């Protein structure tokens, strides 16, 4: 694979405190997994920014809980202690600390899309408008959860004819390792390429070598 900085962007899906800061998260990833995915994503973002790749953070944010409870499944499970998404009606309400992007992952010059209301980061947001304006044809997806928002966004990106790379080291799921791995396999079979950080950086270096040989 060859990746070119001018036509590639990272779409960081819900890498905010609502999932990744156990002290305030309403739908938390396990603490040890938070630290790992943050460290891996921060390293990848820093190296990609250095070669000119744009980082776009997409953040779930609701004006009020009724915007969440209008989904019948979420309304049904919000107070079920057996469900991973219990308490979802309190998740990332406007003004809450959960809506803040993890500081280690944000840098000046990054772009932010805050309209996300459902699993698909394209739905009712200006994400596609932004990608097209930037001349992007390839997206590198990172974020939480592999099993929901990353998965749905990957399928929608391929439906809109973007080339999809999933940064396998920089995604994770509150649904556990087995479901996380299944989601990666499903995306690999259907919509795109799960690559490690090392493989992603290698793909950019390969494109640079091709350019020098012309």
Predicted regions located by residue number:
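Surface-exposed, active-site-proximal loop segments in enzymatic domains
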Residues: 22-29, 70-71, 157
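Active-site-adjacent betaalpha module
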Residues: 1-9, 43-51, 68, 73-214
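Acidic-leg catalytic submotif of subtilisin-like serine proteases
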Residues: 9-19
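A short local structural element in Rossmann-fold oxidoreductases
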Residues: 20-21, 106
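Catalytic metal-binding/acid-base residues of hydrolase active sites
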Residues: 16, 61-63, 145, 171
């Amino acid at each position: 694979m060859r990746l070119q900085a001018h036509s590639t962007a990272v779409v960081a899906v819900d890498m905010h405190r609502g999932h990744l800061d156990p002290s305030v998260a309403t739908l938390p990833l396990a603490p040890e997994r938070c630290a790992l995915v943050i460290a891996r994503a921060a390293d990848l973002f820093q190296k990609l920014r250095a070669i000119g790749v744009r980082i776009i953070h997409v953040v779930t944010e609701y004006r009020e809980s009724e915007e969440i409870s209008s989904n019948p499944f979420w309304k049904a499970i919000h107070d079920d202690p057996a469900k991973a998404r219990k308490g979802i009606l309190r998740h990332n309400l406007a003004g809450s600390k959960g809506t803040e992007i993890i500081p280690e992952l944000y840098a000046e010059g990054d772009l932010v899309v805050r309209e996300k209301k459902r699993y698909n980061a394209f739905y009712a947001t200006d994400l596609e408008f932004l990608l097209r304006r930037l001349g992007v044809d390839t997206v590198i997806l990172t974020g939480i959860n592999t099993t929901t928002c990353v998965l749905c966004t990957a399928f929608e990106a391929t439906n809109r004819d973007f080339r999809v790379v999933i940064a396998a080291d920089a995604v994770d799921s509150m649904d556990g390792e087995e479901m996380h791995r299944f989601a990666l396999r499903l995306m690999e079979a259907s919509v795109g390429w799960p690559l490690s950080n090392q493989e992603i950086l290698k793909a950019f270096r390969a494109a640079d070598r091709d350019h020098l040989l012309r």
